[in-house]
């Protein structure tokens, strides 16, 4: 047990989320518990991880979640480990919710995206159809997130664009999408900033500069692609060519990278297979599976197209393998699934209470110690 690597989870504690500040000590080696010296609260070693309050051995849970993330059938896992189906689904829900928090904490941070591709997947559901929309940063192959909806409409695309905006800086940005009519309006609606003019009322919104939109429209006949047309909806040809050269090394407008990511998700989630018998019964189950697969893809899987050469003496060369998270600068090493499941997402920083009058000296000292 290392008190220097954990933090207090009490949101009302001034030291909440602070690591290595000396406020955490070991409370019980036998019960594997820590104590915060500031608020006096104790918490388990597994607090904030997937293994919190689970009685099953960590190795078993980690193996089961790893198999689920890489597409092993649920029935095979239940037979191999002697587990109940509801238990395995409960662990998948835990892991999916934890991976969503990790994704929102680490991936949804502003960065220069360059080029983003987005697409939707039609999912068979018991009694209906679901649509899964996802986006990817082309240069680093980073999965930017996904959303689910019962309809392929504007609300689905707007929710996806909000995910992309959480990860984007106001820089030159190219969107390559399919022929869905909702993309153009959703991008123009989401990527706007208010203009503060000091006047009362709602401020006017100004669109981002440097946004380019390109569409790839496929024409089908007898379930086969017979023609592909590419069109520029917004932006100039020179700007789009420059972004294509910087993000994918040249070429033409395409959606190949998001379609390849769709194939990865189809191989890991049985309900996404085109001609299969697996159906989605609940939207939350697919939501958790999507975040589990996407986060493992970002942090725990090497991508062959991301490797870079490392030149050695005597004309020798070795390849330095990278994950999408390494290529995006989020981490510097390959994460194991255990490292992902035990990553603790810190709570929001503590805010001093708002009271009338002057703050007390005790409150000033807390603010100076923990809010600086």
PLM features: residue spans?
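Residue-level recognition of single "structural anchor" positions
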Residues: 1-372
